[in-house]
């Protein structure tokens, strides 16, 4: 399949682009410069023959997927394809739905997360999550960031102060908020709230960060700041991001998995997915023919 096939579909791309965006296939991926070869990276998550049901609804079907550490992995696909269900399975949040049942394995650092010996609390400490809508607690910025560390037994004020600064710096928002730490987080803008939520996740020092449509409720400027932050965070963390925004997936991710009807339809380097996909359905989706 020639690259020109996708580039020529600019009219179809309008379903997924805003008028200031470049066509997907021509987006430059500056974050991929000096890329470490995949062969030198460890597998952080390995999903093996995973099936998941909500009652009678077969939401995930025979998922096999290896996710590399210190990568940004994008999960894309039309509504209802299973992408949000999948990342919520990665930290067992799907189990909050009473009717859920699973078959198969998800290995996190070579250990099956569904094993009875695997602590859900420890898993969710290692695997943080940022949701679609910013969800700060109705507390001060300081109390939002220190909530997790306090639950884990940290009481020393000096240590907590250091965690707050480190976490807010990690979320690229320290300079904006350092003189407002006693302010209620609800008073912040949507973009600031989302970065505070990211800082709150960083405060517990996770290994993996799951992001479920983290910028869908944000304005373009705030979205850009979060995207830039994602690129910085992957130096220390493995990031898995669900997004409907094709340009965002192309800009920020190293690998992309296209989900369709509960299956992984295609999984490859992001450059290849967006310039020369192997599957016609993948091409049709990223070109705006459906979804």
UniProtKB/Swiss-Prot annotation:
GO molecular function (one): ATPase-coupled phosphate ion transmembrane transporter activity
Gene3D superfamilies for the chain: P-loop containing nucleotide triphosphate hydrolases
Region Disordered, annotated ranges: 1-21
Example GO BP: phosphate ion transmembrane transport
Keyword Transport: yes
Protein name: Phosphate import ATP-binding protein PstB
Enzyme class: translocase
Entry's family note: Belongs to the ABC transporter superfamily. Phosphate importer (TC 3.A.1.7) family.
Topology in the lipid bilayer: Peripheral membrane protein
UniProt keyword ATP-binding present: yes
InterPro entries referenced in this protein's UniProt entry, alphabetically: AAA+_ATPase, ABC_transporter-like_ATP-bd, ABC_transporter-like_CS, P-loop_NTPase, PstB-like
Location of the ABC transporter domain: 45-286
């Amino acid at each position: 399949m020639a690259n020109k096939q996708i580039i020529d579909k600019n009219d179809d791309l309008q379903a997924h682009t805003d008028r200031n965006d470049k066509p997907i296939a021509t987006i430059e991926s500056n974050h991929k410069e000096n890329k470490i070869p995949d062969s030198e990276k460890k597998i952080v998550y390995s999903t093996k023959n995973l099936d998941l049901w909500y009652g009678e609804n077969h939401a995930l079907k025979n998922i096999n997927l290896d996710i590399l550490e210190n990568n940004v992995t994008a999960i894309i696909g039309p509504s209802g394809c299973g992408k949000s269900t999948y990342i919520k399975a990665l930290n067992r949040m799907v189990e909050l739905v009473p009717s859920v049942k699973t078959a198969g394995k998800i290995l996190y650092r070579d250990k099956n997360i569904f094993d009875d010996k695997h602590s859900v609390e420890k898993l969710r400490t290692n695997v943080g999550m940022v949701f679609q809508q910013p969800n700060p607690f109705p507390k001060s910025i300081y109390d939002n960031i220190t909530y997790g560390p306090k639950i884990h037994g940290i009481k020393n004020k000096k240590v907590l102060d250091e965690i707050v600064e480190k976490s807010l710096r990690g979320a690229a928002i320290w300079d904006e908020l350092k003189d407002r730490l006693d302010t209620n987080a609800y008073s912040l803008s949507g973009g600031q709230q989302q970065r505070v939520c990211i800082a709150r996740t960083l405060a517990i020092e996770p290994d993996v960060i799951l992001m479920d449509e983290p910028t869908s409720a944000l304005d373009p400027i705030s979205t850009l700041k979060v995207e830039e932050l994602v690129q910085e965070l992957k130096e220390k963390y493995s990031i898995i991001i669900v997004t409907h925004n094709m340009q965002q997936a192309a800009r920020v991710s190293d690998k992309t998995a296209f989900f369709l009807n509960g299956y992984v339809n295609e999984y490859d380097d992001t450059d290849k997915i967006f310039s020369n996909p192997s599957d016609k359905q993948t091409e049709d989706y990223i070109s705006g023919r459906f979804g």
